[in-house]
Amino acid sequence: HWQTHTSVCYCLYGSKRHMLLSIFNDYSMPFYKFGDILFLQKIERKDWVAFISQRFADTGKQISDELSGMIADKMKNHPYYTQQLSQQTWLRTSKECSEAIVNEAFNSLIGQLSLLFTNIIDSLTSRQISFLIAVADGVVNFSSKDILKHYQLGTSANIKNLKKATLEKDLIDILPGNTIEIQDPAFEYWLK
């Protein structure tokens, strides 16, 4: 019973932004107005490079800053996936890491996740899938007739519903400037 705890501070965090906002901002939820909401920025590439390179060095293995950066870039600085890819790369490295090792680890990680991603896709409509593919392809102007036709999204009025549905499923984030981004970088790569 959290209500009875005294002199305690809690930090609840996660990458499912829509779900977290709902938990703390929805009147019907148990944590309504429970505390402050802070949006943290992603860890910067340069910090990942230093961290990954140092962790390899700490265990007697070598990885160049370029390859450490490649790991962070492939995972778009997403903390969970950057650490997963780093671990998979580290496990495959005996002494010195190569680009081939990073790529092998990346492909293996995507392969491990493919069943999960297939289950996600199976829960979506064909237009929701097409919308996600368009987002993964970097589309920003969804009202363009060419885009609507190419991705078979229906009418421009349908875009609002597609955004809402995929946002509620925590598949996308809508960033400042109304930029749409797929939350999961591994899922985004898999979609392509």
Question: Where does each model-flagged region fall?
Answer:
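Amphipathic alpha-helical "lid/sensor" segments that cap RecA-like P-loop NTPase cores
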Residues: 49, 53-116
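C-terminal leucine-rich, beta-strand-based interaction scaffolds used for sensing/assembly
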Residues: 115-192
